[in-house]
Amino acid sequence: MNKLYGVGVGPGDPELMTIKALNDINKSKTICYPGKSDDTSIAFNIVKQVVPEIDEKIKVCIDFPMTKDPFILEEAHSKITNDIKELLKKGDVALLTLGDPGVYATYSYIAQRLKADGIEVITIPGITSFSAAAAELGIPLTLADEELHVIPSSYSFEEAFKLKGTLVFMKSGRSYEKLASYIKKEKFDYDIYMVENCGMTNERLFVGAKNLPETSGYFTIIIVRGLK
């Protein structure tokens, strides 16, 4: 039976892709990736830099809905699952995802549905955006007994500041202005870092709350260290 590979391609730098990710992409008949077109799909273009022969494969662009509406999501996930089932009739399928497939990725919903239907699904982990961001900043995420909390900042984030250790705010772009304003207003005595478009050619790094920019893009990570 043909398999679905959920392939984490890392945060943006193609050199951060794993050998296993490359091998499973190469062995797959069809490559699926998020976006509206080849040109605008970040995941596809990361892979294309190191697997130029990807253009010779069957390519399917998947438009994942950016919404919290459960009805829209249910309909979309059902359609995507059925589409992948059809593609699996032709051979193995690699579904690309930015970062790691297990961290806030639509892939996980699709994988669960396919597994329930008896289809073999293999997940290939990727380097997370926040691990890469910390490396770019030259800082540790945790030391000794410090806790690490990953927060989707597109939801409520205020309560997170009551936690201890390190906070990582993902998907900060949509709520960035609100989050940055909150951090500046509260004048927290913590170490504040921000990375926009980690690993990409337009990457930007910021250190300190006072240096946070007024606006930022969707692929923004904010790291808060030193909560006690």
Positions of PLM-derived features:
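Class I S-adenosyl-L-methionine
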Residues: M1-P14, I19-L22, N26-I119, L212, ...
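A contiguous loop/helix-start segment that scaffolds small-molecule binding in enzyme catalytic cores
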Residues: L4-G6, V93, K162-K228
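Structural signal for conserved beta-strand scaffold positions within catalytic alpha/beta enzyme cores
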Residues: Y33, V60-D63, T123, L143, ...
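Short gly/pro/ser/thr-enriched loop/turn and capping motifs at secondary-structure boundaries
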Residues: D38-T40, T67, T128-S131, M200-N202
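A short acidic, often aromatic-flanked loop/helix-cap motif at beta-alpha or helix-coil junctions
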Residues: F64-F71, S156-E158, M200-N202
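Short, surface-exposed amphipathic charged segments that create phosphate/polyanion-binding patches used
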Residues: I72-T81, E136-I139, K162-T166, L205-N211
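A short, acidic, amphipathic alpha-helical segment used as a generic capping/interface helix at domain edges
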Residues: D83-K85, S153-E158, R174-I183
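Class I SAM-dependent methyltransferase SAM-binding "motif I" and its flanking Rossmann-like core
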Residues: G102-L163, P213
